């Protein structure tokens, strides 16, 4: 297995990203307990532009224990090419784990532009900057580098009452959000096939767990029940969805 030394986590102040950083440092985001599941001893650079869904308070314990030593935060938009290039060079990044994304379906319907900018152009900026930074003089890539792209199962469309998605399921995005993620997936795979960029990609289902923004379905349902408010019904209410606990998702990402 490659020895990971300097990991760039995009969107690390968001829900899944902040939980992943906790996981890397052996801190359970649920109860603060220590565990050493990841067995990671390197450095983490968290790049996040702190939109409404980003919250550095989620990483207060990480900052207190590792800030300035093994954990570093950079408030940077992933579309900012010069800043991304600076970070790659300054921290000698060998691994990028790309969580950063606009991810709320309803918001994508009301304002799709931000989703195209972040999810498509931001991913392109990261891929191209990494390609240039990791490329050796002979055109091949360093053998210690990897770009992992986090995607969603929504790129496959909607399931019926039976069946399941697989790696060979055709893409069938149905919203500006899922379309933007499908686009970023194709760009990522193009960099793998065209340039040979060391790359892995995962398409995960819905996550739930600590630090989740309250607009998401499970915390929204729970808060509405608590406050005696009506529960939202999407479409006819017959859509099938599943969820995975965020720490289980992050274990899978680390295994990949």
Describe each region flagged by the PLM.
Residues 1-207, 247:
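N-terminal Rossmann-like NAD(P)+-binding domain of SDR-like oxidoreductases, especially those catalyzing
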Residues 139, 232-235:
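Short, hydrophobic secondary-structure boundary micro-motifs
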Residues 163, 214-222:
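A glycine/serine/threonine-rich, flexible loop-to-helix segment
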Residues 174, 205-215, 235-247:
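Glycine-rich "substrate-gating" loop/helix at the edge of Rossmann-like oxidoreductase active sites
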């Amino acid at each position: 297995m490659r020895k990971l030394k300097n990991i760039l986590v995009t969107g690390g102040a968001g829900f899944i990203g902040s939980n992943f950083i906790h996981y890397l440092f052996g801190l359970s985001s649920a109860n603060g307990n220590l565990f050493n599941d990841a067995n990671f001893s390197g450095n983490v650079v968290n790049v996040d532009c702190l939109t409404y869904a980003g919250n550095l308070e989620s990483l207060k314990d990480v900052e207190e224990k590792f800030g300035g030593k093994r954990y570093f935060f950079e408030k940077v938009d992933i579309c900012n090419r010069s800043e991304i290039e600076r970070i790659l060079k300054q921290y000698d990044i060998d691994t990028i784990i790309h969580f950063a994304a606009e991810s709320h379906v309803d918001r994508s319907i009301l304002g799709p532009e931000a989703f195209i900018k972040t999810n498509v152009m931001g991913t392109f900026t990261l891929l191209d900057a990494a390609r240039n930074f990791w490329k050796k003089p002979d055109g091949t890539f360093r053998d210690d580098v990897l770009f992992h792209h986090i995607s969603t199962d929504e790129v496959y469309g909607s399931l019926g009452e039976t069946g399941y998605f697989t790696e060979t399921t055709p893409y069938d995005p149905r919203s500006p959000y899922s379309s933007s993620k499908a686009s970023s997936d194709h760009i990522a795979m193009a960099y793998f096939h065209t340039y040979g960029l060391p790359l892995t990609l995962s398409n995960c289902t819905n996550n739930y767990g600590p630090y989740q923004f309250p607009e998401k379905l499970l915390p929204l349902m729970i808060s509405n029940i608590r406050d005696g408010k009506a529960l939202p019904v999407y479409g006819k209410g017959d859509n099938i969805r599943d969820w995975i606990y965020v720490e289980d998702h992050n274990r899978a990402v680390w295994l990949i």
